[in-house]
Amino acid sequence: MTQKAKNTIYLLILIILSMLCLVYASVPLYSIFCKVTGYGGTVRTATATQSKLGKTTIKIRFNADINKELPWKFYPEIPYTTVKPGEQKLIFYRAENLTNEYVSGMAVYNVTPYKVGKYFNKVACFCFTKQTLSPYQKTIMPVSFFIDPNIETDPETSDVKLITLSYTFFKYKENTK
């Protein structure tokens, strides 16, 4: 085999390995990108609210879905609320385990329209950790959030009057690796 053929084979192997590494790293990298930028309706987390209050009022609608593998009831206590940007709100979802076994679930979330994700900040949320309910247990799950007042000055979001905060609960499966 000529040296040129060997170099071509080495290059192809290097390209394939690079592509495999990129595929393996793409999910966590995309997740980090979405959390940092708010892309795709990904909500940001915060430790405190803004000190300035906005002038407009925005209606927040709450949505709750459950994957068919999770035997729970899950719903918001109220269907919507209103909030001024910068104002911290505390709302509650309710969950109930419908079985006679311990069941764990994990919630994923987003907001729509997607363009407001970078302005929607969660201070506390049940979605940050796995939730385990004992047999037939009913529980209340709090969510504390605020909307960054800069939403009012961004030309892409200044006209937003309705935001939907949506959760989907999935059955938590322990990693068996």
Curated annotation (Swiss-Prot):
Membrane topology (UniProt): Single-pass type II membrane protein
Family: Belongs to the COX11/CtaG family.
Entry's Gene Ontology cellular component terms: plasma membrane
Protein's name according to its UniProt entry: Cytochrome c oxidase assembly protein CtaG
Topology Periplasmic: residue spans: 30-177
InterPro entries: CtaG/Cox11_dom_sf, Cyt_c_oxidase_assmbl_CtaG
Keywords on record: Cell inner membrane, Cell membrane, Copper, Membrane, Signal-anchor, Transmembrane, Transmembrane helix
Functional note: Exerts its effect at some terminal stage of cytochrome c oxidase synthesis, probably by being involved in the insertion of the copper B into subunit I.
Pfam families: CtaG_Cox11 (PF04442)
Cytoplasmic domain ranges by topology: 1-8
Keyword presence, Transmembrane helix: yes
Bilayer-crossing regions: 9-29
Compartments where found: Cell inner membrane
A single BP term in Gene Ontology: respiratory chain complex IV assembly
PANTHER family recorded: CYTOCHROME C OXIDASE ASSEMBLY PROTEIN COX11, MITOCHONDRIAL-RELATED (PTHR21320:SF3), CYTOCHROME C OXIDASE ASSEMBLY PROTEIN COX11-RELATED (PTHR21320)
Any one Gene Ontology molecular-function term assigned to this protein's record: copper ion binding
Gene encoding the protein: ctaG
Lineage: Bacteria, Pseudomonadati, Pseudomonadota, Alphaproteobacteria, Rickettsiales
Primary localization: membrane
